[in-house]
A protein has these predicted regions:
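Conserved helicase/translocase motor-coupling segment
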Residues: 609-675
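ASCE P-loop NTPase helicase motor core
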Residues: 88-97, 104-105, 175-288, 346-360, ...
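Charged C-terminal transducer/switch regions of large nucleotide-driven machines
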Residues: 1-62, 66, 260, 267-272, ...
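A short beta-strand element within the Helicase C-terminal
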Residues: 502-508, 691-702, 725-728
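Accessory, charged alpha-helical segments in nucleic-acid-processing enzymes
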Residues: 1-188, 280-292, 306, 320, ...
């Protein structure tokens, strides 16, 4: 039962107020109190000698933590304002000052779900014997694996009634409310627009995700998060599945002079190494700055933050424009090759226009020209538009240059579009120079360092030097964590590096796509807040087929939510599945590693063109070495090894350490390493994640694309390791189906390379994506039958079916895009293949309703025609349809005709598209 009050009486000798347990009654007097003690005696006290606190309220069924330690003997808190008394039944504590050292949490009433998930985890560990492969390969099914005994013991020690940890929120599917940011966020390690957003999101949210594609500065972002947590007196653990990732963080901090607050713990060997080499040095006087300089820094950082936000926005616009320019120039190069225009004719046509076109007007002119039937007279309105809107002086030009005029407009569009981009680039570059972008960023970093350094100086000047060792640091952990608020560890060993029950303020999981959910759950139990850093398009944790079947059976047995599926999800994907839109996720967009054309493939294929490429490069970065021998046996290919060896010795003599050779199979990688010159490094892709080389050589080994070597995560990582050059060694006979990762990669390499050297002339032209995407925009604006989509009712339905359902909802079609009203003349490279009447039909602006194409290399894949019943029963239209069918058959482009009276269109499109792509239905 609670006491009605607590009372402190002033000791006459010490003049200190002391808690008195033996007071029975208190009576308020005019000038003080009359106090009756439990022995029956009463005394009067002046008001200056008494502190009286009446009972306010109780909290029952609670857990009480003092300085992070659970007081398990108490379950109720009585609140007296400035003081708290803890009790269980009639057993009570002395009063505690109400302060930040005390945490009061409601006891969880139901942990059935949590226990079920943990039972599922235990069954996996007990039956499979371990968690996931360290070195996954195709042919080696039994590599060294992490001992499950450590994990099972750790699971048994986790307190599922602990409600303060991130594990509690993760298992309950809760994400606590967003917090208010500190007034000053610092970036002593530099930043860009995305990194600033990521740091702020991490500090505001209890659970957050940072998606960091290759070369986007994940480590720099982590360092800035750490700096802000330190100045807020927070503790942080940084973990990864392997030591190399966290050691990278350590090396960066030590290299910049900030090793003073970092402890590299984890397994026994790491701990021993850390404490054996531990030397406490006094904080450097270089970190000390004047009060005036600190005040200036705190003022300037706010002003610079606003300026830099604008600078970052414009810097990203500039990079995006440069990527658009590169794409436009490559596409224009294809147009010049596939739709050549005589320079004299071009000059003559230039003179026919008295008004200069712009790129948008060129597209509108193309639309108008496509609507003109060659044998029909021009309407008066059309003549006026040609003369006054587009500046065409001589209307006889339409007849004189009937074959060349649309090609001329196509060329003109690219010239003007490229000119527009170059003008925009120049304008933004001038803006950035005038606003001192680089100088302001450097000042921003310097003032951030000033604030960070002075905090460290003041903190470490006050800390007493203590001798910590591997055998005593746990017993002195309160002091240890003050000296070393940043702990580095593997995910497996974090819980063994800290006292039981200790919670970090923050946990950062790096390379999270490789971390399974069991080890993640253990780490979550050690922290209040979590930042998960990784890339869902890179390598994930690996589970062998036998273990996968066992784990899937347990999932069904325990009825486990898909979000906690050990087989399907690493921790990054688990959080996405669990929280969907209810977790803050920031994509680091700015890419700083690869040649623009190299990362361009990854950007288009895997990142939905969201990356902002900050690199440059004048060289062409791709090479394809074709061998005339097909795939080898035993998962290796000696001819590819020989070709790789020859190329390296010819092109990288004396620079062998700049080259990495990647193979999908361990056997091939081992034989590569045996034959390569010293310094060149050959391995499977799993050893290259998180690293980079000037040149990467990828050996396909096989001559057919199978599921193992065509893994999208593997190809993405392989390509994005290359800084300057990416080379593929492959059999000449290798088929390249649309939609496969290797197929699209090779197609992209051919598409972007030197046209004269590598493009094999066939009968089908590439799709001019930019021209028709922009043209479709103008085309739609001309039509009023629908606010968003133009065309007949049937075409509108088909547009929505393709664009909103079929293409976006099937991962197999991630590289397929669509254009409308595509001109046959833009598809047919060689008119000499056809008789005069068919060639004339092609020239007469005949079009395909829908063209599906591979957006990686612009190759046409499938044509779709929507046939109205009454219209297409017309004899003249039937003749046109026959000619169109013949043309498409001749150039080898599959055609699907859909009738407005047909049915099951969606399934027919999917079947036809799969067949055209070489996929099995």
């Amino acid at each position: 039962m609670n006491q009605p009050f607590i009372i402190y009486l002033k000791n006459k000798l010490t003049s200190r107020f002391e808690y008195s347990r033996n007071v029975k009654y208190v009576t308020l007097l005019n000038n003080g109190y009359r106090i009756t003690f439990t022995n029956g005696r009463s005394y009067n006290y002046g008001a200056d000698r008494v502190k009286y606190y009446p009972f306010l309220y109780s909290q029952n069924n609670v857990r009480i933590y003092v300085r992070g330690k659970l007081l398990s003997e108490y379950s109720t808190v009585d609140n007296y304002g400035a003081y708290l008394i803890f009790r269980h039944g009639n057993f009570s504590s002395s009063p505690f000052d109400k302060n930040n050292d005390i945490e009061i949490c409601s006891i969880k009433q139901d942990v059935i779900k949590e226990k079920t998930v943990f039972d599922y985890f235990r069954q996996i560990l007990q039956s499979i014997g371990e968690t996931s492969f360290d070195i996954p390969t195709d042919e080696n099914k039994n590599p060294n694996q992490i001992s499950a005994d450590i994990l099972l013991k750790a699971l048994d020690n986790i307190d599922l009634y602990e409600s303060r940890s991130a594990l509690s929120n993760y298992l309950a599917g809760k994400n606590p409310a967003v917090r208010t940011l500190y007034d000053t966020i610092i970036y002593p390690f530099g930043c860009n627009e995305s990194q600033k957003k990521a740091v702020e999101a991490s500090l505001r949210n209890s659970l957050s995700i940072i998606e960091g594609p290759p070369g986007t500065g994940k480590t720099q972002t982590i360092l800035n998060i750490v700096a802000n947590l330190i100045v807020q007196n927070k503790t942080v653990a940084i973990v990864s599945n392997n030591n190399s990732a966290v050691f990278n963080v350590r090396d960066k901090l030590e290299g910049l002079g900030y090793g003073i607050f970092v402890a590299s713990l984890g397994n026994k060997e790491n701990k021993e190494t850390f404490f054996e080499t531990l030397k406490e040095y006094p904080i450097s006087d270089n970190f000390k700055i004047s009060t005036k300089r600190l005040q200036d820094a705190e003022k300037n950082i706010i002003e610079l933050n606003s300026i830099l936000n604008l600078c970052f926005q414009n810097r990203n616009k500039l990079a995006t424009l440069k990527t658009k320019l590169l794409d436009a120039e490559v596409e224009f190069g294809h147009l010049i090759t596939e739709q050549p225009l005589n320079s004299k004719i071009k000059l003559d046509l230039d003179k026919k226009f008295y008004r200069k076109l712009d790129s948008n007007k060129a597209l509108k002119l193309k639309y108008l020209l496509l609507k003109i039937e060659p044998d029909n007279k021009l309407s008066f309105i059309t003549k006026l538009r040609l003369i006054f809107q587009y500046g065409l002086i001589d209307l006889n030009t339409l007849d004189e240059y009937s074959d060349e005029l649309v090609t001329y407009v196509n060329h003109k569009f690219y010239e003007l579009y490229i000119e527009d981009i170059k003008n925009d680039i120049q304008r933004i570059e001038e803006w950035l120079i005038s606003h001192d972008e680089k100088e302001n960023l450097n000042r921003f970093i310097e003032v951030s360092k000033d604030i960070f350094n002075v905090f460290l100086f003041r903190k470490y000047k006050q800390l007493a030097q203590i001798s910590f060792g591997v055998n005593n640091y746990i017993s002195q952990f309160d002091d240890f964590i003050k000296h070393y608020p940043v702990i580095l560890s593997s995910t497996l060993s974090l819980h063994t590096s800290i006292p039981k029950g200790f919670l970090f303020d923050y946990l950062i999981i790096d390379e999270s796509s490789q971390v399974d959910i069991i080890k993640s759950a253990l780490c979550f139990s050690c922290s209040r807040n979590v930042v998960v850093v990784g890339d869902s398009m890179q390598l994930t944790h690996i589970v062998d087929e036998q273990s996968k079947a066992t784990a899937e059976a347990f999932q069904k047995e325990y009825n486990i939510s898909p979000a906690y599926d050990y087989v399907r999800h690493n921790i990054l994907n688990s959080l996405k599945s669990l929280y969907a839109e209810n977790i803050k996720s920031v994509l680091l967009k700015e890419h700083y590693r690869c040649h623009p054309i190299i990362i361009g493939f990854c950007n288009k294929k895997y990142y939905n063109n969201e990356l902002v490429v900050m690199t440059g490069g004048d060289n062409h970065p791709f090479k394809i070495i074709e061998t005339n021998i097909a795939g080898g046996r035993g998962n290796y290919n000696q001819r590819q090894i020989d070709e790789t060896d020859f190329y390296i010795r010819e092109n990288y003599f004396g620079k062998y350490d700049k080259v990495g050779i990647i193979a999908p199979y361990r056997n091939h990688a081992n034989k590569l390493q045996q034959q390569m010159p010293e310094g060149a490094e050959a391995d499977t892709i799993h050893k290259f994640q998180g690293r980079e080389k000037d040149a990467i050589i990828f050996n396909t080994v096989k001559n057919n694309i199978n599921q193992f070597i065509d893994n999208p995560n593997l190809i993405n990582v392989a390509v994005s390791r290359a800084v300057k050059e990416f080379i593929v060694v492959m059999p000449e006979s290798m088929e390249l189906p649309h939609g496969t990762n290797i197929g699209d990669l090779i197609r992209y390499m051919y598409y972007t390379t030197n046209l004269n050297d590598t493009i094999v002339k066939g009968n089908i032209s590439s799709v001019f994506d930019l021209l028709y995407k922009e043209y479709n925009r103008v085309f739609i604006s001309f039509l009023s039958s629908n606010k968003n989509i133009g065309g007949s009712a049937a075409e509108i339905i088909m547009h929505k079916l393709l664009n909103e359902k079929i293409l976006p909802n099937n991962p197999l079609y991630s590289s397929i895009d669509m254009v409308r009203e595509y001109r046959l003349r833009d598809l047919v490279r060689n008119l000499q293949l056809f008789e005069d009447d068919v060639a004339q039909f092609i020239r007469r602006n005949s079009r395909i309703d829908f063209l599906l194409y591979n957006k990686i290399d612009k190759t046409p894949v499938l044509a779709i025609e929507v046939d109205g019943v009454s219209f297409h029963s017309n004899e003249l239209q039937q003749e046109r349809d026959r000619k169109k069918d013949y043309v498409l058959k001749t150039i080898g482009l599959p055609l699907l005709r859909l009738s407005t009276e047909g049915h099951n269109e969606e399934q027919r499109i999917i079947e036809s598209l799969n067949e055209a792509m070489g996929l099995k239905n």
